[in-house]
């Protein structure tokens, strides 16, 4: 009877140990894989923020320096085109500068997500603020794009004449600024997607 009790107790103890250890090993393996995956996304996030900063600063600087004066003038008139002649372009410069400033300030939080890829709070904060920056950036770029279109093509229904034949440099700079702004919009949209994917549970 003693040998029978020993034969029955030993397998029971070994099976309980196996059942207790197996899930822990599986969880540890999944945890490590998820951390490496999210760290890779965080590094990509940081690089995209640098690209978005460059695009936003280029857009704001180009629009802010768009100024052209025609070489001919009359006794009472001087023909000049500048971004501050149009409130839409003024809004563009201010809004894109705000977006660029936010992106610079967001870099430390992006670094935190690289060091601690499983941290939820900084990633959630970046998701909310990136969405707000994306909305502001899109509004500024879209409004400026409408004015640039009118500058190139005019509007015959309202007798608005195109001015780009006379102010070629001005139109070239404003068009380049709008293109750079939409590039930053694209980068921000990708950042929002990355933040959403990073918050997804493994």
Curated annotation (Swiss-Prot):
InterPro entries: CASP/CASPL, CASP_dom, CASPL. It is a multi-pass membrane protein. It is found in: Cell membrane. GO terms for molecular function: protein homodimerization activity. The chain crosses the membrane at residues 41-61, 91-111, 131-151, 177-197. Residues 1-40, 112-130, 198-202 are cytoplasmic. Residues 62-90, 152-176 are extracellular. Keywords: Cell membrane, Cell wall biogenesis/degradation, Membrane, Transmembrane, Transmembrane helix. GO terms for cellular component: Casparian strip; plasma membrane. The keyword Membrane applies. GO terms for biological process: cell wall modification; cell-cell junction assembly. The keyword Cell membrane applies. Belongs to the Casparian strip membrane proteins (CASP) family. Homodimer and heterodimers with other CASP proteins. Interacts with CASP1, CASP2, CASP3 and CASP5. Regulates membrane-cell wall junctions and localized cell wall deposition. Required for establishment of the Casparian strip membrane domain (CSD) and the subsequent formation of Casparian strips, a cell wall modification of the root endodermis that determines an apoplastic barrier between the intraorganismal apoplasm and the extraorganismal apoplasm and prevents lateral diffusion. This is Casparian strip membrane protein 4. The lineage of its organism: Eukaryota, Viridiplantae, Streptophyta, Embryophyta, Tracheophyta.
């Amino acid at each position: 009877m003693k040998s029978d009790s020993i034969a029955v107790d030993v397998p029971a103890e070994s099976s309980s140990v196996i059942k207790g250890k197996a899930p822990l090993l599986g969880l540890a393996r999944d945890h490590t894989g998820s951390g490496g995956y999210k760290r890779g996304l965080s590094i990509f996030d940081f690089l995209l923020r640098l690209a978005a900063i460059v695009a936003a600063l280029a857009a704001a600087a180009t629009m802010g320096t768009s100024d052209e004066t025609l070489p001919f003038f009359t006794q009472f008139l001087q023909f000049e085109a500048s971004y501050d002649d149009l409130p839409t372009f003024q809004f563009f410069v201010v809004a894109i500068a705000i977006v660029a400033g936010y992106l610079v300030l967001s870099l430390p939080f992006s670094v935190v997500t690289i060091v601690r890829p499983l941290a939820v709070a900084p990633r959630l904060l970046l998701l909310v603020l990136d969405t707000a920056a994306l909305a502001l950036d899109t509004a500024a770029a879209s409004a400026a794009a409408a004015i640039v279109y009118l500058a190139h093509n005019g509007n015959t229904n309202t007798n608005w004449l195109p001015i780009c034949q006379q102010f070629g440099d001005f139109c070239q700079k404003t068009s380049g600024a709008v293109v750079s702004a939409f590039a930053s919009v694209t980068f921000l949209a990708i950042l929002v997607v990355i933040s959403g994917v990073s918050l997804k549970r493994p």
